[in-house]
Amino acid sequence: MLSPRARAAVRLALDEDLVSADRVLSRAPCDATSVALVDPDAVAVGEIYPKCAEGCVVSGATVARAVMRAVDPRVKVKILKPDGSFAKKGERILEFRGRARSILAAERTALNFMQRMCATATLARRFVDATRRWGTLILDTRKTTPGLRVFEKYAVLCGGGTNHRMGMYDRVLMKDNHRRLWRGGDPDALDQAVIAARRAFPKLEEEVEVESLRECASAL
């Protein structure tokens, strides 16, 4: 089940393909080519699988299913490789069956999500595997594609990584700009910054980025 924010992003992605931006050329969702050429009663089957030789970590299978069902709830989708599993080249991740027009309208959006998410998950897994012996956590950041954060951070989880913070609302993180603005950047005043943050948001974790042992000692 996708979150409301994820469902809204799926809807927006479909609208980019199926609804005219000015609502003049198309007043209803429309795949013009399929409407012109494909019998409305035609049935099609399809599948999604990795083409890359090295395979991939699966991420976004549930999103692809949501895309298909958002276009046509009657499309039957079967997930064969769940998110977080590994799929070899040519190994089917999911298969679907339904009205050909519906599948053609949804397939590119479904693939766009899956390609990006599988790539992110696969890269995250490489970092996780490379550092596993030291018990290192691989964290993500907020440097995400606008509107796609929920998917990209989920992909990091599928790859074995760890979400750092979803936004600016769920953790206090004092960076260089905050340090400069706090009491003129006094390196000995970070302890008071931590106290002020804790007083304002007592239930949130606090982190401080430091650039010297002096700043570290003050923050601690």
Where are these regions (language model features)?
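Acidic/glycine-rich phosphate/pyrophosphate-binding loops and surrounding catalytic core
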Residues: 1-220
